[in-house]
Swiss-Prot record:
Annotated family: Belongs to the plectrovirus ORF2 family.
Organism: Spiroplasma virus SpV1-C74 (SpV1)
Keyword Transferase attached: no
Main subcellular location: host cell
InterPro entries cross-referenced by the UniProt entry: P-loop_NTPase
Protein name: Uncharacterized protein ORF2
Residue runs in coiled coils: none
Topological relation to the membrane, as annotated: Multi-pass membrane protein
Subcellular location, record wording: Host membrane
Keyword Transmembrane helix carried by entry: yes
Amino acid sequence: MKKFIFFFKNYCYISGSMLLFSLIDLLLWIISLYCVGLVFWILFALQCVYFVWWLWKNIFYQLNAFRLVNFVWDNPLSVIIGKLGTGKTLLLTYLSQTMKLLTDEIYSNYPLEDDKVKVLTFKNLDFTDRTKPVPPDDSVILFDESYLYIDGTSPHDEKKVHSGKIPWIVLARHFRHRALFTAQREGMIWNNIRQLASGIIIPISLKKPVAKKGFNFFNRFFIMRMGIFQDITDYEIWKTKSVERTAEGKRAKHKSDVGLGIRFFKIIIPLEFANKYDSEWLKFVRDLKNDEIVNEKFYYWSEITKLSVKERLELFDIDILKKNLKPRKEKGNGKDD
């Protein structure tokens, strides 16, 4: 029943965006009623072509949605790698809704406007911690901005601090967990997670709905093109070749290889999913810092000339200059004097 509701909801979403084309098809049908001979058959053929295209596009997006859901479900550890603005958090939010087809245990480390999604922190996955429980079987764990928790560029230092997470990383399959971690670069993800991840998801492009005032019926979904890999090595090879082709002025290849577990496809993400999260929810951290500042004044550059050289140096807070420009001790202060 859940799959039927999910299919029907997305099907209607696409159909609504194609209402304009349906009106055009209706217009062609009305015109064909007043035509005979060759003109009639041409209009009839256009209607048939449009209907086949419309039906294929609906089924195409639905199959891709199920392909992504099954891919995540089959991989205990997955990473989402993409530059800023490619829709990593949007994709996590989309999965927070679509993975409900298979489980009710959804956890995230960022706020979602969903009563069925539970709060999760890194301590839930730490076996040296005795304050927060590990999620139960068939849990989907959505972990955004993983670099804020573990510095992937310093794996040896982090291993000492986060050694309690290693048992969970290794045993995630035994716990029947499905976890996804996001980062802008693969090197930002902790090596222990990156090397054991059997699912690599790469958002390639994101077509956003066009913001319009008033009635906005035809632009209510995102279209995301992505690639999925089952091995980090395959992804790195594809990335290297893509960079080489781009440097030569060629387009990067997005060719699927089922044998290697490499697929490229598009999904649609309803606008209502994007409204379930705030992409700037961590801005409260700025307030924590500013609350402890005594002098909150900001200077204009036109005011700098009114300050003394010493005040400017203190204001700019350039440590190297402050260290090397310390006043020397005056002569004559030695013991001989």
